[in-house]
Amino acid sequence: MITAIEITSRAPFVGGATFGEVGAYERLDGVAIGELDPAHPANRGIVNIDKAPRSAHGNVEYRSDICILRPADPERGNGRILYEVNNRGRTLLFANLCGGKAGNQPQTTADLGNALPLRLGFTLVWSGWDPGAPRANGGLGLDTPIATDNGAPIVRRIREEFISGTRGGELQQFRLNYEAATQDGAVLTVRRTQSAPRQPVAFEFVDARTVRLAQGTRPELGSIYELRYDATKPRVLGIGFAATRDIVSHLRNSATGRDLLGRQPTHALAFGISQAGRYLRDHLAQGFNRDEDGVRVFDGVFTHVAGIGRVFFNTEFAQPARTRTWHEDHGFPEVEFPFATGELLRGDDTKVIETNTSTEYWQKGASLLHTDPDGTRDVALPANVRGYYLPGTQHGGKAGMPRDAGPCTNPRNWHDPMPAIRALLVALDEWVVNGREPPPSRLPRIADGTLVRAEAVAWPKLASLVPPRAADDVVAPGDWTDPQPPSHAWQPLVPQVDADGNEIAGIRLPDIAVPRGTFTGWNLYKAPLPEGELADRDGTHLAFATTRSPDDPRPSLAERYPTHEAYRERIADVVAELQHDRLLLEEDAAACLARAQD
């Protein structure tokens, strides 16, 4: 439960700017202080909570950063909470959903993009859930206790993986998730790909949380460095689930929450992108969508680009920032059978929308959300779940994505799926508040041939289009500290394509339905990264030729669209259909039509 919320800063948001009929917003920053009874049934599933130090009341204490954006006049808001789960301490709502520039500290309205959630009148809430999340630049963190064995340090041999230049900049040294109990016996190896043999590497400890290669050497770009060492001081990470649960429940149901928000919220929705979406899947699966009194926390949950993943979190010495793709983070526990969303809900009737892109089918086993584990038949979703596929889109797709090749073989995918996500967020809100059902699920299916094995995808014959060897495996989790060959693997499937190489099923936004090129959710690395390996998150865009080319079997732009007016008419038809199906908001429809004029 929450014992106090201490507000340390309260100010007009972005200079008192107004957002439609809702008007101005206030920003409140502070700390939520909570404590948990380890014996309470709602908390017993938290790993090592029984090994955490206790307060004078016999409870386990925690402190979470919290940020609230509330209408300055609460009665002009819609009376509902939209809680965004942060991604490694970062808020993504404005930068991704809204097409803005903001990180955690927006300063101007330009940082907020279209500011849709504010114009809709939501009270926005963020809080810390990961003790390892960086707090720099306004990052949101959580303070939890260190577990011990009756006061003695817990020490365990664990494994960590580091790769320079793929998910971030070049690494000069490696920062460990945990403190090394001893430097003795630690072993560092390197391999170029997941299947290559490990080779020992000389290294040294800089301090108990940092290692580097021997003086004069730097990590090879893209190679997999693996450290095995004796770690100590594991925090009780699973408290993060309880912190989210208790903060939202407190804001919804307590007098303190009413005073902070200016009114009693009627409903609460949760939204999470990537890691944050996987966190929400795990939050549901582990039963944390009911508070200690059994009251539902979130009435609606929206996960975007989570695939079938959960988070490596409620485990001793867990590392929640890890996520498996073709080249990275194999052997860490992230997936857990059963995968289908209906199995996560544990009888909870919260309404769920899940959206995934092409990348999640190639890299994150997303097909297993709606097929049997062997990939032989489609499985129906429960009545309170909708699933939507965003074809021709990469994992991090949003407005303003780069179009050059970057670290990849092909030019990167710039398709923006967020117009559909915005429409579906509105649909989830309507579903929760007044029972208006959202559009039917739009997913690739085995039955109609739009979901197939990777080797059955009918790619057009292009010299520049070299498809992946396979989709990434989905395997049974084992001992993550010393992985062995998996005991079982499930069968992920991927979306089938048309003659242009564009995927057939799902919500085909105008750039896919009336294409000027081929969009995929995958790309391949080029040197100096491991050449030919499936890139971590990047997709591909291969533009059509302007006029007929003997080297390109795809019709040229001139053949498809004899006049600009013909192109505009086709865009208008697609926009009208998407609006009719409630998959495109009016403002986004107008923007699509305006772009088609260019």
Residue ranges and their predicted role:
Residues 1-598:
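C-terminal His-loop and adjacent cap/lid subdomain of alpha/beta-hydrolase
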